[in-house]
Amino acid sequence: MYILIISVIVLFLAYLRYFPLDYDEKKHFEEIDNQRKSDFYSVDFGKKYFNLWKKDKRNVFHSIKWFLEKKPEYNYEKGKYFPENKNIAKEELRNLTESKKDFIIWIGHNTTLIKTGEHFFLCDPVFSEKIFFTKRHTKTGIDPVILNEVFKDSKLNILITHNHYDHLDMKSLKRLKITGSIYLPAGVKKLLKGINAAEIKELGWWEHVESGSLKINFLPAQHYSHRISQSKNSSLWGSYVIETENG
């Protein structure tokens, strides 16, 4: 019996070793050109979402192979192209928010703080040192305690792009005193148990919300969604475009 189990494992690993993962750019764009135009009309088929441009053909074998493969190591040469990520003190952040200049501050990983006019947005807030057993490779540029103090009397809105753990971290959201609204993709709101905000608004592709002089648009992105508590592509993913009175 043990020999049979070991044999199955060896055969499975051998299969993964030679499982094709090569990317063919020419074939990729040929498939996009041949995509049926009717596929662009809707993104929700039978409670599952799909990419508009090209359906995802990856499966569990791709994920296992990627997990088992040796990853390229981070080195100094790559580090030279890495954006600067420094710790921002409370007074420095307060001065930035009170200035008339708009800004985008990279806080680390996928988290950014955006100021446009008198409006503030925190995109995909992640402050945890580990996300789903994976240690982060960038330090956190702003302590959430500082964010809570600086935005105590003003609205800080939250933008969530999709449900992956390194973009939607419940521990990080619970550390924030959210004074504004939360905008997120369709199907993700159910995950936000115990999160308080002035408004929690789900959006589908091409939908928008108007807030004062702002128009917050939720647009398509080539990606996917998956979480232990949500099956693959059962919730949406996307990108944001914030329109101001100046364009």
Predicted region positions:
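Short, polar loop motifs at secondary-structure junctions
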Residues: 108, 185-191, 204-206
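Catalytic core of the metallo-beta-lactamase
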Residues: 110-115, 210-247
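Binuclear metal-ion centers of metallo-dependent hydrolases, dominated by the metallo-beta-lactamase
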Residues: 2, 13, 196-212
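Active-site metal-binding motif and surrounding structural segment of the metallo-beta-lactamase
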Residues: 37, 55, 135-184, 198-199
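Metallo-beta-lactamase
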Residues: 1-149, 243-247
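Structural motif
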Residues: 119-121, 157, 181, 214, ...
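Short amphipathic alpha-helix with an adjacent loop that forms part of the alpha/beta core around
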Residues: 145-154, 209-212, 229-231
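Active-site environment of divalent metal-dependent phosphoester hydrolases
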Residues: 164-168, 189-191, 207-210, 224-226
